[in-house]
């Protein structure tokens, strides 16, 4: 009898060990890269196994994937059309209303509350950055090769898109023997034309959510863009004198930064402040574990005040350690940060509308959609977005 008791005890032990191993095998899948702070999270949660995944889908196909897939528990996303569409359409899960979550939401500036908080609930957390000068945020400023620019005798930088596009066209027509390209401008989907479209929206969208694309400045910019597109050489290997949206805070070094061009003389163009966030898939099968992951990311932030970009003195910008800036760099950062805007609730830069509008612009650049028809369709879509915003 004793023998059977030992066998039973051994079997029970093995069964319990098996159950423990099953409990430890809960897999949490993050659509995004590994993070530096996950080592501590994994040590604190041995019952969880973190899997990281990536997707090659883009545009509308990517948005559809995130709206329908149950394979991911947490999304790693830039604040932009995809994130805002998921938030507005209810495909993200709010974090629980704990005192800690409310305190964190209250600590955010308005620009960040606009994208992370909805109806009083916290829906996302900035992704901690190990090295960034401004944690979680990168400024969409432009860089230029000042020495080469002066070497080519180019004078003042173009202050408007019209000046820039005219110079781009002239360069392609007359400077093919130069060792430099004028600008790094990808005209495909998501490239330079999309950046110019987004800049127009950021600059001209009104407070009540309306915008008009049938303006002389937009017509001229699109006409020049199409002219340039007809001579654009995508495989040009020469060094570019201007790199749009290439000067991020993490790459400061000795770069000389310039603000993006405006659409009209005398204007100051807004600078996009790009924010990466974690958000929980509303279809997750592990909501508690996913929330634990996002809350751990919040704890990994150096301090919430580092998210305050537009009012922070440059000398205080740091990431775990004090960053020493030269006086010239500090003044430049301060000037740029005053222009910075986080892409928030623009109806024109969200979801289906944005990707359809971008596709229309590509059709125009490829000669399959006349300019008048492009502007008509853009205004039609803008009106649809405004109507949805009122509902």
For each of these PLM feature ranges, what is it?
Residues 96-108, 181, 187, 202-221, ...:
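Short, solvent-exposed loop/beta-turn-alpha elements that line the ligand-binding surface or hinge
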Residues 1-10, 17-84, 89, 372-391:
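Conserved N-terminal structural module of periplasmic/extracytoplasmic solute-binding proteins
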Residues 81-139, 259-260:
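Hinge/lid segment of periplasmic solute-binding proteins
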Residues 84, 196, 219-289:
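Extracytoplasmic/periplasmic substrate-binding proteins
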Residues 306-363, 388-391:
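Long, aromatic- and glycine/proline-rich binding clefts that accommodate carbohydrate-like moieties
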Residues 168, 192-194, 204-234:
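Glycine-centered hinge/linker elements that transmit conformational signals in sensory
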Residues 143, 275-314:
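Bilobed periplasmic-binding protein/Venus flytrap-like ligand-binding cleft at the lobe interface
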Residues 59-71, 75, 89, 166-170, ...:
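Short helices/loops that flank or line small-molecule/ion binding pockets
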């Amino acid at each position: 009898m004793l023998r059977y008791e030992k066998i039973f005890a051994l079997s029970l032990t093995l069964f319990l060990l098996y159950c423990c191993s099953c409990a430890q095998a809960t897999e949490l899948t993050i659509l995004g890269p590994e993070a530096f702070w996950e080592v501590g999270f994994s040590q604190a949660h041995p019952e969880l196994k973190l899997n990281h995944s990536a997707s090659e889908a883009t545009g509308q196909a990517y948005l559809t994937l995130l709206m329908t897939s149950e394979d991911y528990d947490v999304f790693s996303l830039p604040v932009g059309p995809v994130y805002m569409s998921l938030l507005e359409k209810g495909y993200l899960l709010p974090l629980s209303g704990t005192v800690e979550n409310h305190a964190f939401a209250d600590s955010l500036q308005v620009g960040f509350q606009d994208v992370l908080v909805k109806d009083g609930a916290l829906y996302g957390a900035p992704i901690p950055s190990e090295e960034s000068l401004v944690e979680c945020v990168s400024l969409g400023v432009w860089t230029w090769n000042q020495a080469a620019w002066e070497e080519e005798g180019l004078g003042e930088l173009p202050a408007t898109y019209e000046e820039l596009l005219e110079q781009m066209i002239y360069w392609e027509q007359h400077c093919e023997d130069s060792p430099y390209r004028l600008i790094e401008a990808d005209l495909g989907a998501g490239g330079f034309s999309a950046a110019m479209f987004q800049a127009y929206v950021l600059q001209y969208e009104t407070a009540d959510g309306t915008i008009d694309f049938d303006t002389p400045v937009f017509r001229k910019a699109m006409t020049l863009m199409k002219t340039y597109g007809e001579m654009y050489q995508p495989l040009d290997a020469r060094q570019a004198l201007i790199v749009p949206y290439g000067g991020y805070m993490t790459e400061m070094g000795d770069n000389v930064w310039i603000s993006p061009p405006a659409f009209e003389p005398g204007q100051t163009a807004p600078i996009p402040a790009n924010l990466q966030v974690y958000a929980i898939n509303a279809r997750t099968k592990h909501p508690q574990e996913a929330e634990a992951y996002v809350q751990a990311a919040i704890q990994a932030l150096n301090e919430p005040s580092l998210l305050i970009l537009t009012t922070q003195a440059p000398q205080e910008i740091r990431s775990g350690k004090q960053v020493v800036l030269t006086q010239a760099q500090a003044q430049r950062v301060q000037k740029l940060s005053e222009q910075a805007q986080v892409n928030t609730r623009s109806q024109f830069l969200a979801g289906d509308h944005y990707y359809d509008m971008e596709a229309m612009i590509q059709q125009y650049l490829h000669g399959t959609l006349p300019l008048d028809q492009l502007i008509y369709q853009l205004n039609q879509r803008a009106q649809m977005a405004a109507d949805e915003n009122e509902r």
